Amino acid sequence: GGKKILAVGDLHLGYEEALNIQGVGVGRMLFSEMIKDFEEIFDKIGKVDEVVLLGDVKHVFGSVLQQEKEDFRKLLEFFGERCKKIVIVKGNHDSIVGFFIRERTEVRDFYIVDSVCFLHGDRDFKEIWEEKITTWIVGHAHPAIELSDGVKSERYKCFLGGKWKGKKIVVVPSFSRYSEGSDVLRGDLGLVWGVDVRKFKVLVVGEKLKVLDFGEVGKIK
């Protein structure tokens, strides 16, 4: 009878506009594709109690682009119709995300629900080490796995799950289609705690939201 929570990895809204400003014409398809992806997820899981955004909601560090504002407002409306509350965990790109906020929306450095803590992963907080907290759900690292058949290699975003220092940790991939992610087989994920993920499981979400288990990071060739 617990809460039903959808945790969402780094969105990096405003990425297209940042590229367009730099002269890389990428159009405006990305946001509508993102909404389609979310529609597919909600079709499968139904309404939730809360949506938790795990930080780096916006892409451009320290400034607010018009497109970001517009997209963010639409996204909050979209989520607002499908949940009771939205929690935004601040990421390293989100220094000024506060003024976007509307009713039923909170901004936190980290967010604790029962024994689960949602946080970005770029900063440490003493509260997250309390004994009652058994699980961390984190963003920031953008995990992905690169698989090669000898001819071509493809990169797939993945979830990582495992135990470290007595905590169960789930690392959530970036939700942005432009962010390919960092290959977990090539070393450090950039999380503030320097987590050793070699024994963590790699889970890739495939077509029709089917979950594929690739086993432990350290055993993948």
Residue ranges of predicted features:
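Extended recognition/assembly regions associated with phosphoester-bond processing machinery
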Residues: G1-L53, K58-K221
